[in-house]
């Protein structure tokens, strides 16, 4: 089942390139239909009792139901928009227990009568709820590239979203002993049944079980993030799956946190009115008549800045710079081979021998530069610093801006929100990377050279969505993503080695200089 659903991604490429019409052609259409059937069976739109070759009517009805849930035009036809929706990242929990109740509830909302009674029926009729209001939880493991304190902060905040609007209270259980709810990261098949096997990046991000099993599982292969800038936002997915462990099913409201499909972290409240009604229907309003508190999403944009954790028995100076324990926003190197590593509103300078400065505010060196920059590079032609964020660019010569105001990069064809920037010595040009493409800039300006962008496949073995790139004195190019690096042979444009930069690259400043051993 997982492999068949995964083929939808490859089928979509054909569809978007125009090899398939709105209703798939006979040859491609039969294969697409089989993959769509597998998807619809997995998520409960085709009943298990239905024969493996459903009739056209049953298949069309299932497509209609899926289109309605997905806020698509309801046609019953496997068209481009429907197939594209099937490939979007989502929760792995089936929609089976939600569809009929959704239709009933929407009808009630339009009729505007008996609404409260109907809603309560929707959430309580399954009997899947906890019969106590104080619940314990445990974080069993977490992604290696994310700092443990930040992940624990995200978990705590995700539970607090639900306790703020209900009578529930949560506390973290000790490392030993029982816990009502357990949060665990797995890869692939993890003995939950073949239908629940994780499928790598994309597809099903996580799944959970209704009470009172108390389990939520997350795909270890996803590129999890605790910020709004890159990767899948772990906080949003945590909050969604915790909703399932409390007894909530998927919601049809497009703005609901409990909608089946992954939503990005916005600046507004994460819980919709539908989410709040759902949890209150099961557990009641906050105790003592207190008002339900809704926190805006902008408070949860970067959990690593919440980190006040300091392990006992370790001196602060031996813990290494903060970026060593997580990731960074951007990185570059100047003509003296001094590294500049950027994270949030601060930066570090790392000498060639690996000695690291204290973190310094960006505004102390580059006045007017905003926090959380997305890409940085130093031109080895003139030593100027280039910074990129969103659709804007900055150029500094020393501490002084070359341009009075930041420039709009899009005017020259540059991408918005670039992943990384690099001064490439053989071309003596700046290069920007975004997703699966790269852009070569004209010398001394912000114009993209003709015939660009090109595919990242030109850089053999380098992954998409890198977070930084820089040239090394030995002629190699180092690319970074999360906690890993790739070393590229400049002459062959081929990756030769890879590993973990914090423990394997001493010049990154994460090496304990006195002991000569890794910090971790």
Curated annotation (Swiss-Prot):
InterPro entries: Hemopexin-like_dom, Hemopexin-like_dom_sf, Hemopexin-like_repeat, M10A_MMP, MetalloPept_cat_dom_sf, Pept_M10_metallopeptidase, Pept_M10A, Peptidase_Metallo. Its EC number is 3.4.24.-. Keywords: Calcium, Cleavage on pair of basic residues, Disulfide bond, Extracellular matrix, Glycoprotein, Hydrolase, Metal-binding, Metalloprotease, Protease, Repeat, Secreted, Signal, Zinc, Zymogen. Its cofactor is Zn(2+); Ca(2+). The active site is at 241. It holds the Pfam family Peptidase_M10. This is Matrix metalloproteinase-28.
